[in-house]
From Swiss-Prot:
Its main location: membrane. Cytokine that binds to TNFRSF4. Co-stimulates T-cell proliferation and cytokine production. The chain crosses the membrane at residues 24-44. Residues 58-177 form the THD domain. This is Tumor necrosis factor ligand superfamily member 4. InterPro entries: TNF_CS (IPR021184), TNF_dom (IPR006052), TNFSF4 (IPR042338), Tumour_necrosis_fac-like_dom (IPR008983).
């Protein structure tokens, strides 16, 4: 067996220098350290950067309470239901909710009346009123209308009773909320 080398002389079993292994570990450690440094830099830059907040105008809304009629407000079988502001950014003037921004509005009417009433919603001069209730004591109605600047929302109530002076409202409220802010708003 002259062609076979003895095991000690085999090149595959020769000890390798430790320099290559140490060099590989050093390169891996440097790459890992650079990755960690890059992550820390990113986190530090974004945690100390001032946040830019978008400034949207407040959403137009109002919650009003339906009021009890006084004797001077109740002279006919048809009258405007008095409103009192409880909360919100919109205003009540002469028992009407004043619309300052163009857009779609959600109008919600809730309450219980002591006698049967028909309620229509008026919102623009020259336009037909929107009928909400027809001869009922309980109101739980929601409607979405396109309203514009200078519109005034008010409720007209009609009773079959000889006198509306006995009419009372329990837990009555009208809520008006702008659904799509960003359109034209009065300054």
């Amino acid at each position: 067996m002259e062609g076979v080398r003895p095991l000690e002389e085999n090149v595959g079993n020769a000890p390798r220098p430790r320099f290559e292994r140490n060099k590989l570990l050093l390169v891996a450690s440097v790459v890992q350290a650079l990755g960690l440094l890059l992550c820390l830099t990113y986190v530090c830059q974004h945690s100390h950067a001032p946040e830019v907040s978008l400034q949207y105008p407040p959403i137009e809304n109002i919650m009003t309470q339906l009021q009890i009629l006084t004797s001077h407000e109740c002279e006919e079988d048809s009258f405007i239901l008095p409103l009192q502001k409880r909360d919100g950014t919109m205003e009540v003037q002469n028992n009407s909710v004043v619309i300052q921004c163009d857009g779609f509005y959600l109008l919600s009417l809730k309450g219980y009346f002591s006698q049967e009433v028909s309620i229509s919603l008026h919102y623009r001069k020259g336009e037909e009123p929107f009928p909400i209730l027809k001869k009922t004591k309980f109101a739980n109605s929601n409607v979405v209308l396109k309203l514009g600047y200078k519109d005034k929302v008010y409720l007209n109530v009609t009773t079959d009773s000889a006198s509306c002076k006995q009419l009372s409202v329990n837990a009555g409220e009208l809520i008006v909320i702008l659904q799509n802010p960003g359109g034209y708003c009065a300054p």
